[in-house]
Curated annotation (Swiss-Prot):
It comes from the Archaea. Keywords: Nickel. Gene3D superfamilies: mk0293 like domain, Transcriptional regulatory protein pf0864 domain like. Signal peptide: none annotated. This is Putative nickel insertion protein. Belongs to the LarC family. GO terms for molecular function: lyase activity; nickel cation binding.
Length: 396
């Protein structure tokens, strides 16, 4: 699988991401042409050295560096740029991530918000250029290893703020990206955080595979370690996706079966991906249960709170963060004939990234309704629906 990997060991900003993609092989002539046709800027690209490492440096030269724009104005600029449909969609989505974060931090609606640093022409150029470069690279997967956010404080249009600045923190809170802090200055900007959040899946390490090419995008900071963003194009093994999960666990010994039964539904509504409850013998020979919950990191705290509230447990363990291999899933409808009637059943189709179908399962509620209506055994309705789905796929 053709995979793009970002390694932000020294942070990431919009220009570092753009530079890293160009250094990796994205056509700089095309990118400059697209940027300058979209935004009133000029672009220079050169090779520089950061702590002994050669890297590509991208400089966006603006004519109106103090311009403050609303979210609507930013979107209008992107829509008027005649970009490829995918690039336009992605660029708007990146700015929406930034806008939603800024609006929440400042306690206002997106429509009321006015962008300062991230609304200027250089930020527009970075986002449009990066979205176009990724569009042209035709990768099947994008990964990001843990991000160094930096430390200390930074001077902004809103005054001196701690690093990471509140908008960056808000973007990261729902991203699933792993972060750490090393340094005494801002290394991860809101634009960099939004681009990585939108495009990349988190990974705690490099994937297994062959490194095809490596690039380095230069940042502006002068630090002890090279202030560069490393990019890699890899041929990774396997066609299954990876998902970033956490496992929550707690022991209870004084909770009734009725409460535990209700707990399943409650936790799933709070965002749990799976819940299992295992009988166990606790201290002093008491009968109890171990509750295991699989969840995305952004939902873990809410689920842990609900576990405490529902069961009275005083602590919930979070096991080390895990990755799981997952199949891609899509829902389709098939028609089955029983007697003289035609019934529609939803089926879930699991497939890998190359679209090879791995498994098909009929939706239980549809099959149960049909079984009750026509008197055919449930397992026979399920068999017919899944068989019809397989036949449809084999005909394609």
């Amino acid at each position: 699988m053709r995979t793009l990997v970002f390694e932000p060991f020294s942070g990431a900003s919009g220009d570092m991401i753009l530079a890293g993609l160009i250094d990796l092989g994205a056509d700089k002539g095309e990118i400059v042409e697209v940027i300058q046709a979209s935004v009133d800027v000029s672009v220079t690209i050169e090779d520089i050295t950061k702590c002994g490492i050669r890297a590509t440096d991208v400089n966006i030269h603006t004519k109106d560096s103090a311009r403050i724009r609303s979210f609507g104005e930013l979107i209008d600029i992107i829509k008027d740029a005649n970009l490829p449909e995918e690039v336009e969609k992605n660029a708007i989505a990146v700015f929406r991530i930034i806008g939603d974060a800024e609006a929440k931090v400042h306690g206002m609606s997106l429509e009321q918000l006015h962008f300062h640093e991230v609304g200027q022409d250089d930020a527009l150029a970075d986002v449009i250029g990066s979205c176009y470069a990724i569009h042209r690279m035709k990768v099947e997967n994008i990964l990001c290893t843990p991000v160094n956010v930096g430390g200390g404080s930074v001077r902004t249009a809103h005054g001196t703020l701690p690093v990471p600045v509140p908008a960056t923190t808000e973007i990261l809170s729902g991203s699933g990206l792993e972060v750490h802090s090393n340094g005494d200055r801002e290394l991860l900007t809101p634009t960099g955080a939004a681009l990585l959040t939108y495009f990349a899946n988190p990974s705690d390490q490099l994937p297994t595979g062959k490194i095809l090419t490596t690039g380095y995008g230069a940042g502006d900071a002068e630090t002890d370690m090279p202030n560069v963003l490393r990019t890699m194009l890899m041929e990774t093994t396997g066609n299954l996706s990876r998902d970033h999960m956490e496992v929550l666990e707690t022991n209870v010994d004084d909770v009734t079966g009725e409460v535990l039964g209700n707990l399943f539904e409650t936790l799933m509504k709070e965002g749990a991906k799976d819940v299992t409850i295992t009988p166990a013998t606790m201290k002093k020979g008491r009968t109890g249960h171990i509750i295991h919950v699989i969840a995305h990191p952004e939902n873990s705290e809410r689920i842990a709170r609900e576990l405490i509230r529902q069961t009275g447990t005083l602590g919930v363990r979070i096991l080390p963060t895990k990755h799981r291999f997952i199949a891609e899933r899509k829902m389709e409808k098939v028609n089955i004939i029983i007697g003289k009637q035609t019934f529609q059943v939803t089926v879930k189709i699991a497939h890998d990234r190359s679209d090879e179908v791995l498994h098909i399962s009929a939706e239980f509620e549809d099959c149960r309704r049909i079984s009750q209506e026509c008197g055919l055994p449930l397992k026979e309705v399920i068999r017919r629906a899944e068989e019809k789905a397989w036949n449809n796929i084999l005909k394609k």
